[in-house]
């Protein structure tokens, strides 16, 4: 049960890890993104690859897909039970679920990115204002309730992406897909 087509934690990270470690063989041309779908379907038989709005879409959907017996494994968060089972009668008892090893790595959060054209004083002021949210009572509320994060920290692209880049480079056609998508 995947979270959705080309979703980071529910598809790209685990499939990139498994392909890169020789656990799954790529089916189809290595430079076409649809080879990923073919690879998943060949390896997992009845894989659930939902689209936005489908019953099993997202983290809750992947966990529900597993719970309903649609799939044998869900690529979701380790906190899925806590995140999705309170008040949901579709969940099984906690001891009916088992987290499998290895953890595939950590998918980076959604970053706040500063426009490089705003270099210098303007960029520094913007970064300082965003980081000030960490220490301001109203700022903490904004971080938690609007941005859904406990805080902001400055990072480089390399440190932010970490092992994620290594894993997704194994996805067939991913480079061509993103080049075509963002080459405007």
Give each language-model segment a name.
Residues 5-9, 79-82, 117-120:
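Solvent-exposed loop/turn segments at secondary-structure junctions
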